[in-house]
Regions:
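Phosphate-handling DNA/RNA-contact segment within nucleic-acid enzymes
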Residues: 21-123, 137-138
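Replication-associated primase and helicase/ATPase modules
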Residues: 1-5, 9, 20, 25-33, ...
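Short, well-structured beta-strand/strand-turn elements
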Residues: 4-16, 107-117
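A generic short-segment signal for beta-strand/edge and adjacent turn/coil regions
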Residues: 3-13, 61-65, 97
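Generic, ordered loop/turn and secondary-structure boundary motif
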Residues: 12-17, 100, 164
């Protein structure tokens, strides 16, 4: 958490889980058929607008794959982080991962979901990861541009992958 320079105001919403798969199986029985290869993960809870946890993400600390595992406790809700803090009346930023969202004001993380919001597209800016050769990201960029949303286009010379990498490299918020 400290290495990634996560703002202190989020520390109380993040948790260490030494046995992630066992934790998941308690929260959502039979998610994992076994717990071989058990390892610790950072737990990032997803809260809805009523401050109720409806999903959580486990982020690996090492090279374990997948790096992110998101578990939905309510299958009817979109995998969106930040619903408990976003103000839909103000300009909204949408990034891919919860950690990236912690560095931007009024920000949501789509966490792999195709996010649908009932807000004016001109009031939203999508900030996809800087992966110009990733066909899935390029397709999603085109999709949101066609719907008249704002999209950040990274300069060709930027070698950093996402907002958190930029913060860790010494860049600051604008």
């Amino acid at each position: 958490v400290i290495k990634r320079k996560i703002p202190e105001k989020y520390f109380s919403k993040l948790f260490l889980c030494n046995k992630f798969m066992a934790f998941v199986n308690k929260a959502k029985p039979n998610t994992f058929s076994h717990t071989k290869g058990e390892h610790p993960r950072l737990i990032i809870p997803f809260y809805d607008i009523n401050d109720k946890v409806f999903a959580f993400q486990g982020r690996a600390f090492g090279k374990e794959q997948p790096k992110y595992l998101t578990v939905k406790l309510d299958e009817n809700k979109q995998k969106v982080y930040g619903l408990d803090t976003v103000n839909l009346q103000e300009h909204i930023h949408i990034v891919e991962g919860p950690i990236d969202s912690m560095f931007l004001n009024n920000c949501l993380a789509a966490a792999g979901a195709d996010l649908t919001l009932k807000v004016e597209p001109s009031n939203v800016t999508y900030i996809f990861d800087n992966e110009p050769r990733n066909k899935e990201i390029i397709k999603r960029m085109y999709d949101v541009i066609e719907k008249d949303y704002n999209v950040v286009i990274w300069p060709d010379n930027l070698q950093l992958k996402d907002v958190n990498d930029m913060i860790m490299s010494g860049m600051s918020k604008a």
